[in-house]
Amino acid sequence: SVQNKNEDYVASFKGSDFSLKDMDNNIINQNSFDGPLTAIFFGFTHCPDVCPMTLNKMDIVLSKLNKENENLKFFFISVDPERDTPGVIKDYLSNFDNKFVGITGDPGKIFLLYKSWGVISKKIFLDNGDYNIDHSTPVILLKNGKYISMISHRDDIKKSIKIIKKYL
């Protein structure tokens, strides 16, 4: 995946107004990110490594936080809306114990959303005609819709818990 930008770089981005749909066809917009603590992660269901590892790590983190995680919302936002339909995302996220909310929609709107958070995403075409996506992988933490911190894919479970507990 693309090297994670440093935290100051990600913190310089503020998100943007948007309207997309989640995997259950509910409208998701910038107000959906309001609340005590929200985590957003941009990824895709065909990702061979970093996305499933990050989601698995966050699943364990949320389980270890147990009752403390009740105020935490976690959104998985697809950078591959062409393949990641609501049904595909719902099926993919059903592999995890915690309630991750999958978001997909119009590719142009998705592009603007991930750019607004400083996330980089690029299609890499393979010899067989298929493609992979190279993208940056921070788990971005928000409080009342505003950036407060991030978890890198390099942060282990213990460090990830410590980062989240700081804001719960």
Regions found by a protein language model. Give the residues of each.
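Short, internal strand/loop/helix patches
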Residues: K90-S136
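Extracytoplasmic/secreted envelope proteins and their assembly/folding machinery
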Residues: L55-L62, P86, K90, P107, ...
